[in-house]
Amino acid sequence: FMIVSLIACSSTTKKDAYNTETEKITIIRFDKDIYNYLQNPSEVKESELKEKYPLFLQAYGRVAMITDDNDFSGFFPDLRDKFSHPLLMQIYRDALNTYEDVSVYENELTAANTFISEHFAGRKLPQLAMHISGFRQNVIVLNNIISISADKYLGSEYAQYKEFFQPYERQQMQPKFVVRDYLRAWLMSEIVKDSPD
């Protein structure tokens, strides 16, 4: 279970996924936004993505493309280049098809968040998102958003996994572990926040 933890002080998306503890959690579909851009790249879409995901784009660049591009000068060309590979684009489409509807996960996470707020005063889940990493990091953690890489949860028998992952690794790469891994990432980030320097 791999986590990239990038603690940031400002907002990573423009809007909160929810305003109250009892409101339904909505998973932010960063994966769909990036796919939409890749299908028809434009400077307008680049500006929209930078405005909507100011810090998350940088974290995603470090995870998916192993870049430290803080000014975005190479981010979008690198992104287009990475996903120009037919196999990676097929994996991207497979993930989008598998997670076209994420309401079952949102319902489970909403129930978990209700439990958290009732039993742990002042605690709640942050914003939650999905991205595609190209089989890199499972999870990106910022101080107010946790995102999982949907392409790492396509089922233990997913054909493309067999070339890259051992059977014991593939057992964890199933849709039934999506909610578990969101919650695990949140718990680990809370431990980091609470631990003394």
Which role does the model predict for each range below?
Residues 1-2:
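Sec-dependent signal peptide recognition
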Residues 5-8:
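C-terminal motif of bacterial Sec signal peptides marking the signal peptidase cleavage site
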Residues 79-197:
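Acidic/His-rich structured neighborhood in mature extracellular/periplasmic domains
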Residues 10-81:
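N-terminal mature-domain "stem" immediately C-terminal to a signal peptide or N-terminal signal-anchor/transmembrane
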